[in-house]
A protein has these predicted regions:
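Non-catalytic terminal/accessory segments
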Residues: 1-187
Length: 187
């Protein structure tokens, strides 16, 4: 928690008081614990802040992760292009952010569960079913329900229903598979 308070002064307050007033376009900072994304309207502003950010972090004994720190365009795609995974897609806090078309043909930012995170959740549920298959069905159901609901409570954002359903179906298949293996009799 002390790191969060420290980063609040090093990054959040600095960005609002020092950086934003000097920018030509709009900018927005989103931070959770030690992960953050800064969105800029103008590329020139982004490059200037990137330089200043490295200096600011070094001044306070911090450094940015080289592989995670990058500049890339995340503009609305041109009218003729379809959305989906592209150079402007990025991962943040377990989500993949991308552009998609709405029902009315407009562009909107969308979130979906990061592929690796969804795979890890499915594997964790399968491991649980395998290692707890000796427990009563009622106890297994309660535990699986907690796990699936926990995942959906975090990743259940608008536009991510398909991945939530995938996890539920994977949990059902895994549970059924391991229940059938409890004895020689098929259930």
């Amino acid at each position: 928690i002390l790191g969060n308070v420290y980063l609040h002064h090093v990054l959040d307050v600095w960005f609002e008081r020092e950086v934003k007033p000097r920018l030509k376009g709009h900018a927005h900072l989103v931070r959770y614990a030690d992960d953050f994304v800064i969105g800029f309207e103008l590329e020139h502003d982004a490059r200037r802040v990137m330089e200043a950010l490295h200096k600011r972090m070094a001044k306070h004994g911090l450094r940015l992760h080289a592989e995670k720190t990058r500049l890339f365009p995340f503009n609305k795609p041109p009218p003729g292009q379809s959305g989906g995974k592209g150079p402007g897609t990025f991962d943040f806090l377990g989500f993949t952010l991308y552009w998609r078309r709405t029902r009315w043909g407009n562009w909107a930012q969308n979130f979906r569960t990061r592929t690796a995170r969804l795979r890890r959740s499915k594997q964790a549920i399968d491991d649980y079913c395998r290692s707890h298959r000796h427990e009563s069905v009622k106890a297994q159901h309660a535990a699986l329900r907690r796990r699936v609901h926990g995942h959906i409570n975090y990743f259940g954002v608008n536009g991510n229903v398909r991945n939530a359903r995938r996890l539920v179906r994977a949990a059902e298949r895994s549970w059924h598979k391991w229940l059938r293996r409890r004895s020689n009799r098929a259930r």
